[in-house]
Amino acid sequence: MNEEEINKQLYLLQRYQEQAEQIYGEAEIIERIISEYERAIETLQEMDTTSEKDVLMPVGGNVFAYASLKDTGKVIVNVGSGVFIEKPINAAIDILNRKIDDLRKSQERLIKTAEEIKARMEEIGRKISEGDVQVSEKKD
């Protein structure tokens, strides 16, 4: 392997590294969304088992307001494409669980892709190492 080929392989290695980092970043974002959905499920389960109607409502910027719920048996759920529908709590929990399942599948696909990229990176690293030996042997 000559110096130009090694440089090409190094460039490829760098591009793969960037791709892997981007993929792992996307997987991390998905994990945060899953955590948010799981917290929502916990809150819905709590609402379903309590008759207490006083809550702290987030208004943004880590600021909360005291509020009272009129109906703890139903919630408004985003079912996709900006469409919101009133659903009983159990149905809302089912929707969130399906979304979590879909997100986990996406996350698994991303991680599999990242592992494939990592394997390619290891192969390139091996080729470069072998190439470096050949180049350094020629210099001696």
Question: Model regions: which residues?
Answer:
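Intrinsically disordered, low-complexity regulatory regions in eukaryotic proteins
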Residues: 1-79, 83-140
